[in-house]
């Protein structure tokens, strides 16, 4: 998708807020090392925009989901540590070794196949251990031990550098399942050789359980919390300790006075009850501003203004208190005057969780670092 750089709609990303959240996360978790998840376009904030400023914000490494995300970062000239979290097809193992990625491996069979095609460049291996997420990774101690022994026996092709598990409910007030996974983790790794990177703390574990993870709490592998979203949405931790890292803004492209009884947008789901000033904005569900956000209060000139009518692919309308000139700034998420629209506000309005709101932002949205 083409980035719409000649359009007023944009994401304004705050470097200072990101740096603050990094330091806050390290402080709360006690982690000495923080790897920032920049998968899925950095949770919608912009893969390269965030990756380019991560190191100066205190981030010690990057984590992506797929090989192509890592390659894009490397091709942008960024030489930071990169972890590939998701499984990759074994035929691409030489590419992962070429770019010096810490590569997640989920089975001995994968290692055996990779051993046949790897060249002089060693593959840095990150072993996945399934303690209850039931997504990827080995489940038995024997399988884990066999993987480690294979890596040691084939050190000409592999470097055993990482091991991890992923907690499914570390941000849940009911920590029963977290405790079950934690206990399973320690049972599985007991007595086995550990690499230099032992990482189990996702955002929830880092914020609420770090002291319960002795020997495994020096690395925080996080995303949500650094992007300014409290993982439990205020249940287990204070929302106001984190800073929002972006604002979403646009500007009026058309303004007209509509008489009473007129339908607005597709299906005429909103009908004016009186003469109403209507403004048009160049943003829609094609940008990730979803249909679920219909009727959300936008901010214009320090006032709350209701979005009206069905949200179209590229445009939507807003009811104005009076006529505004074309080009007037509109804040969808962020501050205007005494009011602020947060991700939590949009979540309460729509039912869409904060991290899903941002991940939905499409590549068409212009992204810019503002401080």
UniProtKB/Swiss-Prot annotation:
Q: Which UniProt keywords apply?
A: Isomerase, Pyridoxal phosphate
Q: Name one Pfam family in it.
A: Ala_racemase_N
Top EC class of this enzyme: isomerase
**Which transformation does this protein catalyse, written as a reaction?**
L-lysine = D-lysine
What GO molecular-function term can you cite, just one? lysine racemase activity
Activity vs pH: Optimum pH is 9.0.
Q: Which SUPFAM superfamilies match?
A: Alanine racemase C-terminal domain-like, PLP-binding barrel
Q: Which domain of life is it from?
A: Bacteria
Cofactor dependence is on:
pyridoxal 5'-phosphate
Q: Tell me which residues bind substrate.
A: 135, 313
Q: Name one GO cellular component term.
A: cytosol
The record's annotation in InterPro entries points to: Ala_racemase, Ala_racemase/Decarboxylase_C, Ala_racemase_C, Ala_racemase_N, Ala_racemase_pyridoxalP-BS, PLP-binding_barrel
Q: What is its EC number?
A: 5.1.1.5
Q: Locate the active site.
A: 39, 266
> Which positions bear N6-(pyridoxal phosphate)lysine?
39
Tell me which Gene Ontology terms the entry assigns under biological process.
Answer: D-alanine biosynthetic process; peptidoglycan biosynthetic process
Q: Kindly state the subunit structure of this protein.
A: Homodimer.
The record ties this protein, via NCBIfam families, to: alr
**Family (UniProt):** Belongs to the alanine racemase family.
Functional summary from the UniProt entry: Catalyzes the interconversion of D-lysine and L-lysine. Can also use arginine and ornithine, but not alanine.
Q: What is this protein called?
A: Lysine racemase
């Amino acid at each position: 998708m083409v980035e719409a750089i000649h359009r007023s709609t944009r994401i304004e990303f705050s470097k200072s807020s990101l740096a603050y959240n990094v330091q806050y996360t390290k402080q709360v978790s006690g982690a000495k090392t923080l790897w920032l998840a920049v998968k899925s376009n950095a949770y919608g904030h912009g893969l390269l925009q965030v990756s380019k400023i991560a190191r100066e914000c205190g981030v010690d490494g990057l984590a992506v989901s797929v090989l192509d995300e890592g390659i894009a970062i490397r091709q942008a000239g960024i030489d930071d540590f990169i972890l590939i979290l998701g499984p990759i097809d074994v035929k691409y193992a030489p590419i992962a070794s070429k770019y010096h990625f810490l590569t997640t491996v989920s089975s001995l069979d994968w290692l055996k196949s990779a051993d046949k095609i790897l060249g002089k460049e060693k593959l840095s291996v990150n072993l996945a251990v399934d303690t209850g997420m039931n997504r990827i990774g080995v489940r038995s101690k024997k399988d884990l031990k066999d993987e480690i022994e294979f890596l040691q026996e084939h050190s000409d092709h592999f470097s055993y550098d990482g091991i991890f598990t992923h907690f499914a409910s570390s941000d849940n007030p009911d920590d029963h399942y977290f405790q079950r996974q934690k206990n399973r983790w320690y049972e599985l790794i007991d007595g086995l050789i550990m690499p230099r990177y032992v990482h189990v703390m996702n955002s929830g574990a880092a914020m609420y359980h770090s002291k319960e993870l002795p020997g495994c709490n020096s690395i925080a592998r996080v995303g949500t919390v650094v992007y300014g979203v409290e993982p439990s949405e205020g249940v287990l931790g204070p929302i106001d300790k984190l800073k929002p890292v972006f604002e979403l803004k646009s500007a009026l492209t058309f303004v007209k006075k509509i008489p009473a009884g007129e339908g607005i947008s597709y299906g005429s789901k909103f009908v004016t009850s009186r003469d109403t000033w209507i403004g048009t904005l160049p943003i829609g569900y094609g940008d990730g501003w979803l249909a679920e956000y219909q009727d959300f209060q936008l901010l214009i000139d320090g006032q709350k203004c209701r979005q009206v009518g069905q949200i179209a692919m590229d445009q939507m309308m807003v009811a104005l208190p009076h006529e505004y000139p074309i080009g007037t700034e509109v804040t969808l998420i962020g501050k205007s005057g005494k009011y602020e629209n947060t991700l939590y506000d949009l979540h309460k309005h729509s039912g869409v969780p904060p991290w899903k709101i941002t991940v939905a932002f499409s590549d068409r949205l212009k992204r810019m670092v503002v401080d």
